[in-house]
Each structure stands twice: as structure tokens, then as C-alpha cells.
Amino acid sequence: MRFVVALVLLNVAAAGAVPLLATESVKQEEAGVRPSAGNVSTHPSLSQRPGGSTKSHPEPQTPKDSPSKSSAEAQTPEDTPNKSGAEAKTQKDSSNKSGAEAKTQKGSTSKSGSEAQTTKDSTSKSHPELQTPKDSTGKSGAEAQTPEDSPNRSGAEAKTQKDSPSKSGSEAQTTKDVPNKSGADGQTPKDGSSKSGAEDQTPKDVPNKSGAEKQTPKDGSNKSGAEEQGPIDGPSKSGAEEQTSKDSPNKVVPEQPSRKDHSKPISNPSDNKELPKADTNQLADKGKLSPHAFKTESGEETDLISPPQEEVKSSEPTEDVEPKEAEDDDTGPEEGSPPKEEKEKMSGSASSENREGTLSDSTGSEKDDLYPNGSGNGSAESSHFFAYLVTAAILVAVLYIAHHNKRKIIAFVLEGKRSKVTRRPKASDYQRLDQKS
């Protein structure tokens, strides 16, 4: 039965991974250009809770310190073993092999199939798989592989590690800190549990590798293969998959990744369009624009802004302060109409300057969004250009030779026509020869 379950899981994962292989390589090249470091900016439409919980498309997830039940089973976090494909494998310093089995890391076993795995402080959920690594990249292919520095052995047997034994089948697993129960029983995690439709993976400090899933490293680049990546401080949520990270979750409508200090090829032009509108509305009411409001509304654009644009931002608050001081000076004298007119003029000039600043920032961010696409498409265009260049060179060479040898070519063609006429006598000629003889 164990082998059958493992084979079924392998087939399901292979079927899901095949259509994503084409797009994964291109996006990995594009996303791998920039390393990520720094803070994660949140999308304006993202709903965040103080504990860092995410809502998923099919199922909700519970926040930081609350346990939840999964669709098939509730799962245990950091120091509890999970079962994979009816098999739980535990290890501390052993590396894992991939077969059709899930492999566990330092203090936990990962569970594949229809079982979910939770991390230390966060919960994650994905359509086929959810990966919630703390400082690691996620890897699955119908298999949860969770190595730290050590080999993991595969088989149809449950393997025990230094501190925690794991039981396979429908048996309860007891670990160092928390007992893990399988079946339809609820499992109590240390800090939180997550729900998953198919699979949740919860490595602590371990890299997971995926054939069809994104990797979410702490200081590494985000890669997407039609999947969302959730870094440490901002997990992203997509219609197909969601990956959650350490503290705070992000919701993204189909394939909008959250990033740290680098952008992904996919951008939200709608955000850039809606941003100036929201800013102009605020300017009409207040006559000024706070940089914090712009940062929160722009969401991901804060990470994309280049140093010159940051200087533009820093100049904007000073421009706002000057009109305020002028307005305060104008309020001193008790003259009626002249101060009011001056206030209106100053507020109008400040609003126009802020509008220009926001427009320049939005256009700059749009350009920054286009740069990764340009760099990604540059290789493809260069390859196409090379092909066109080769074909053009061949055509030029042929035409050049034909032009200088046109007399020979014409003579050859004419000789061929004449030879056909002479070498093919008609049937009537044969009949005449027969009659004469």
C-alpha cells in the first residue's frame, strides 16, 4: 500500500510539473539576476493581520498563535514529525533522497499526499503544495524533501532520528516536544497550524527544492514557475498557490509575487495607474502628500525605486514643509482676503509639485518594471536576431554568386531545356521507324 500511495503521489506531481517547466527556466533566469535583501513591501490591497495570517483562495489560514485543522489532517510544526505518502521519515543530520517519498529535516518530518505541514511562526497553503520555509527555499514534486546537512534514506519504512521517532501508516507519531496524530484527528502545533488542499511543507532552516514550485529564500532571488513566492516578511497569495513566510502574509491575485528589494518580471500596471489618482484625491483634500502614504499605496514600488527617485522623494517633503511654513506665516496677520489667496496659491503649487513627483515616481517604477522584462527578453531577441543575421548572410552570398555567374546559370538552364528536347523523341518517330523497316 505504501508503494502504491507513493506512486500515485509521484504521478500527480509529475503531471503538475510538466506544463510549468517551460516557463520556469525563463523566469528563473530573470528572477535570478537580482539578489534580494531588505524589507518586503506590501500591496495596497493586501490585508495583513498583526500576527501574520493569510487567507487563501480555497481555504482560510489561522494566524500566528492559533491552531487550525487541515482538510484531511491538522499538522504539527517545528519539532514534530509529519507523514509523507503514508510514510514518515525523520532525521537530524541526514540528507534526503527523492523517490516518491517525503523527507524530513532537523526536528520535523514532512508530510506529502493530502497532508499539511506547518512552520515555526507561519502557516501556508497552496493548491498543489504550499511551502513555508523560514530561511529556506521550497522544494517539492509530490515529495517533501527537507534536508539540513544530512542524507535521508528512502524506502517504505519509517526511519527514526536522534530525538524523535516517527510512525507511518495511521499510527500516532510521538516526537521530542509534541505528539503528532494522523487520520482525521486535530494536531496541535507549537505556534500555528495551516490548512492545505494538497500539501504544506514546513522546514525550519532547511532549503526545499521544487520541480514546479517557487523557491523563497531569505536573501536569495525569488523564482516563479507559475507559482507565487513568499519571502520572510511578506508571503504572497495566488489563485493557484500561496507561500507564507516567517511573520507576515501577502495576498496577491493570480501570480503577483511579493519581493524584498528586487522586482519580478510580472508587474501591476493597474497599481501604477491607480496610484496617481489616489494621490491627487489626497492632494485636493490636504494640499500635500506624505511620503509614507505614497509608500504604503505604491506597495511594491518602494523596492523598485532607484536612488535618483529616492532623492526626488526626499525633496518632496521639504517642498511640503515650505508651503506649511509659509501658510503659518500668512496666518499671523489678520488680513482677510490676501492671506487666503496666498494660501490657495501655495497649496495649489504644492499640490502640482506633489503630482509631478508622484507621476515621475510612478513612471520611473513602470520603467523599472519594464527593465527586467527587457533584460529577460534581451536574450530571446538576441537569439532571434542572430538567426535572422545568419539567414540574411546566406541569402546575400547566394545572390552575390548568382549575380556574377548569371551567364553560366542561364546557359546551363538553356542547355537543360535543349537536352530534354533532343533526348526525348516522340512516340510517332518510333512508329515511323517501325513502318519504314
Curated annotation (Swiss-Prot):
Q: Which UniProt keywords apply?
A: Cell membrane, Glycoprotein, Golgi apparatus, Membrane, Phosphoprotein, Repeat, Signal, Transmembrane, Transmembrane helix
Keyword Transmembrane on entry: yes
Membrane-side (Cytoplasmic) residue stretches: 403-437
Q: What Pfam families does the database record attribute to this sequence? A: KCT2
Q: Which GO terms describe its cellular component?
A: clathrin-coated endocytic vesicle membrane; endoplasmic reticulum lumen; endosome; Golgi apparatus; nucleoplasm; plasma membrane; trans-Golgi network; trans-Golgi network transport vesicle
Tissues where the protein occurs = Isoform TGN46 is widely expressed. Isoform TGN51 is more abundant in fetal lung and kidney. Isoform TGN48 is barely expressed in embryonic kidney and promyelocytic cells.
Which of the residues are on side Extracellular? Answer: 22-381
- Which residues are sugar-modified? N39, N82, N96, N152, N180, N208, N222, N373, N377
- Bias (Low complexity): 105-114
UniProt short sequence motif Endocytosis signal, positions renumbered to this chain: 395-398, 418-421, 430-433
Q: How does the entry describe its membrane topology? A: Single-pass type I membrane protein
UniProt entry tagged with the keyword Ubl conjugation:
no
Tell me where in this chain the PTM Phosphothreonine is found: T302
> What does the protein in this record do?
May be involved in regulating membrane traffic to and from trans-Golgi network.
- Its protein name is Trans-Golgi network integral membrane protein 2
- The species is Homo sapiens (Human)
Q: Which gene encodes it?
A: TGOLN2
